[in-house]
Amino acid sequence: MPRLSQWFVRMALIHLALGFTFGALMLSNKGVPFYPLLWRLLPAHIEFLLLGWTLQLALGVAFWIMPRFWEAPARGNETGAWVAFVLLNLGVWAVAIAGVFALPAAVTFVGRVLEVGAAVAFAIHIWPRVVPRTG
């Protein structure tokens, strides 16, 4: 597995653990209320599981399994994929922190722009590798 895929999967697992933990805390607080402000974790819970876990795992596996080029470097210039990794994680954390601490909407907007930038950067990187392999 390439190093970038390892990092995507590791970060996805970290986001899964955080999202699961936040969800468990909110669920237990719903059954036995002990700290009302735990509901502020809901945006982070959603962000960590939908984009931090699901999307990041998909991108890491896609980088790994998509067809490689016949010549070196086999996966092409990886810079775009690394940029996607950094932008996605910055975006996920910006949106999560903005929701938890009730920061201005501009912080959430910046986080979403970073996430879109990650999608564009990854798409640009992976596009040349979307080819049929016959024979």
Predicted regions span which residues?
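Hydrophobic alpha-helical transmembrane segments of multi-pass integral membrane proteins
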Residues: 1-135
